Amino acid sequence: DYISCRIMNLFVETFFNNAMITELFLVMRASGVDTFDILVYLHEHTELYTPAIKEIIDRFILMTKEDLYDSRKEAENVLNNPDIVQKHLDNELGINELLACKADLYLIFDDINHLIFRAAKDILVTNNKLTVSSEMFLGQLCLFIGCRKKDFYKYEDEIEMDFDFDFKEIDINGYDIDLDNIDEFKCQKKSLRFHHTSFQQKIIKSMINININTPV
């Protein structure tokens, strides 16, 4: 089913490409759970979607269907119409629904972050691998990823948060951590400060100014 494949493509773009949630996927892989299995679980369990996520996916499906033609002949007629082609070139027609909806999903980062972690934990429960310690760690990893990657465009903001796991050491290990051994990384509460350097702020500000009116 074409629409089903397109939805999976949206999930791959949103959660996997550009390393958006890579820390979770690395931990899960080290614990015997494949990344694709998590994405398939998301695809199959639509009941987990928040209203905001469901609205974006429904819009993505609608836009995808609008791009389809009833016949090859109809598609050829459109392609052979110079006026329609020119309107696409002038951005008067057409939209990259994949990029548009990926951006919309990023803007509700808390929703998608909690969704992917919910899927991961459900799989661990099914495999009888979710312990008190691993559940606690995944909860804090979810917060950690949110602090690092949510609202990047608020480049002057600073966030400080306490954690019960040594995320600096975990990061050094490349998140190649089997959840069965997660207690080894427990520590006294450590406070981490998340912020952009002045150089990073300059780059982000420049990219926002360049792309603010760019059509998707």
Model-predicted regions and their roles:
Residues 9-12, 60, 64, 116-127:
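Hydrophobic, Leu/Ile/Phe/Ala-enriched alpha-helical segments that form helix-helix packing faces
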Residues 1-38, 180:
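A structural motif corresponding to the C-terminal lobe/cap of the Radical SAM core domain
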Residues 31-33, 47-61, 163-170, 187, ...:
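Short, surface-exposed, charge-dense and proline/glycine-enriched linear segments
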Residues 40-79:
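Polybasic, proline/glycine-rich intrinsically disordered low-complexity segments
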Residues 13, 17-20, 36, 50-54, ...:
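Residue-level signal for secondary-structure boundary elements
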Residues 2-5, 9, 24, 38-42, ...:
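Generic structural hydrophobic/aromatic packing signal, biased to beta-strands
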Residues 72-216:
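Charge-dense, extended regions
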